[in-house]
Amino acid sequence: MLFTRIPQQYAPLGGELRYAVSQEAAGNIDIRIVDAAAGPAEGIGATASPDGANGAGTAGQTGDGSALLGAKRFAAVTEAGFDIAPYLRRRVQFVPATGGTGFHPAAGRTVTVHVEAAATGEAVEAVSPARTFRPGAEAAEAPCLLTSMPLRRLIPEGACDELTLLTDGPCTVTVTAMAGDAAAAESYRAAEAGLHIFRLDLRDFPDAETLTVDAGTCGTVVYTVIPARQEAVRLAWRSRAGSVEHYSFPVLQTEVVRSVRQQAYGPDGRTAATAETDRETVLVSAYEGRQVLEALAELTSAPEVWIARGDTYTPVDIASDEAVVQRHGTLSCLEIAVRPKRKTRTSWN
């Protein structure tokens, strides 16, 4: 039994992750998708060929149940092709990084797996090389910066931002803060290749007017610091690029409270038994170029969105179903409606 097709390292979970396995004689092929972080089952072994296909492994039992992420069976075949992405997407969990400027763990944002192949009821015959897959909808080649926002950005005083780097080796990020004619630089290093989260906290650079974040071959992001507005709301969201993006909406246009009461009617008239309250806030962006508005439009389909206040990220829901990203002959801003993840329920009787 032989693996004839294996996805590339750090392929995106938003697309297909197709494997293929073949055997000489027709028969059943059992496929098991195993969490590599849980460790291979004892007795399983395999050697990857130079082109990424995998030779037969030594006899052994399949991985334990705690490591099993999914399974498939193909009946009476010599070849089997399958997509494992649907089994893995639910394993990715995004939590925005918190803390000071520097690299932070990307825990939960990638999934590393082996795929095992065996005849039904038999020992494992082939094991694919371990592959790490990342969130996102499009392929990217390291080294690169995973983002849907432009590389020149505005950021309010005291705010934070997050950069997602895909590296092919050690990476050094240098942050240069400019204040008038004075410049100060700090360097941060990640020793290993892979997916890295770099957080920029402007509280570490209180007097900066501009900041340049130079990640070497991954790319450079330039920030212009603007005054913070008291009524501004900073949103963070999981983007199609597989990153967490941030943007401060300077205008809070409306805030509406809606309540639905459940009532009973008795001798004394109507009596409120319970009430459900929902609060919806409409935010308006600054007048932005097309690239920023396209990135903000992802909010309408983002699987996870938060309101960012310092190191506190509060999950919210997006109530808007559409976003206008261009109007002929005029600059455009974008309106987005947000609401709490849960309604407030009150019982009176």
Q: Each PLM stretch: what is its role?
A:
Residues M1-A228:
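Preference for solvent-exposed, low-hydrophobicity sequence contexts
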